[in-house]
């Protein structure tokens, strides 16, 4: 009976995760303008990565994606959105880091109040989502292991 209940729970959770869309939550962009996360949806699939300046695996993941991004962009039209969850006291460090790391091809957003983090049920960083061109969340993953960025790219390619 417990196995059956677990299976039913897993199926329900699987179906609900596939039907989720990006919430209508406001964040700041690189210029300090307040925008909705939905405004980044433009028909192209994207990787959304939640990170912070104190999270070494976050920075490793974003750098690994950045190293591969030129090759990936030759194969598929996609984008990367880096969402800093640094608070108002440390967001200036996050802004400086996004520029210093050379993440020029990223859309960098700042979730100072962690409203988007809460709305997307992010508890740990790094937390990465794959979102299709319509704003539907199709994949979610916590943590980073070197090489796992290739799995993200495979999932992006599968959306085309």
Task: Show which residues each predicted segment covers.
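Short pre-active-site segment immediately N-terminal to redox-active cysteine/selenocysteine motifs
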Residues: 43-46, 51-54, 124
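Hydrophobic beta-strand anchors of alpha/beta hydrolase catalytic cores
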Residues: 47-48, 80, 128
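Sec-dependent N-terminal signal peptides
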Residues: 4-15
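Boundary of Sec targeting at the N-terminus
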Residues: 19-20, 33
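Thiol-/selenol-based redox modules, centered on thioredoxin-like
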Residues: 130-160
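Short, internal strand/loop/helix patches
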Residues: 97-131
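A short beta-strand-turn-helix
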Residues: 25-45
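Structural microenvironment flanking redox-active thiols in thiol-disulfide oxidoreductases
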Residues: 59-101, 113-118
């Amino acid at each position: 009976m417990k196995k059956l209940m677990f299976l039913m729970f897993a199926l329900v959770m699987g179906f609900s995760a596939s039907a989720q869309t990006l919430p209508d939550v406001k964040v700041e962009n690189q210029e300090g303008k307040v925008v909705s996360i939905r405004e980044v949806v433009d028909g192209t699939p994207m990787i959304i990565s939640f990170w912070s300046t104190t999270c070494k695996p976050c920075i490793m993941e974003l750098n690994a994606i950045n190293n591969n991004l030129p090759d990936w962009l030759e194969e598929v039209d996609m984008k990367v959105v880096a969402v800093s969850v640094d608070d108002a006291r440390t967001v200036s460090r996050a802004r400086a880091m996004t520029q210093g790391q050379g993440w020029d091809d990223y859309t960098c957003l700042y979730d100072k109040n962690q409203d988007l983090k809460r709305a997307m049920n992010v508890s740990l960083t790094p937390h990465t989502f794959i979102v299709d061109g319509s704003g539907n969340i199709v994949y979610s993953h916590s943590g980073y292991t070197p090489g796992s960025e290739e799995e993200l790219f495979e999932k992006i390619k599968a959306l085309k």
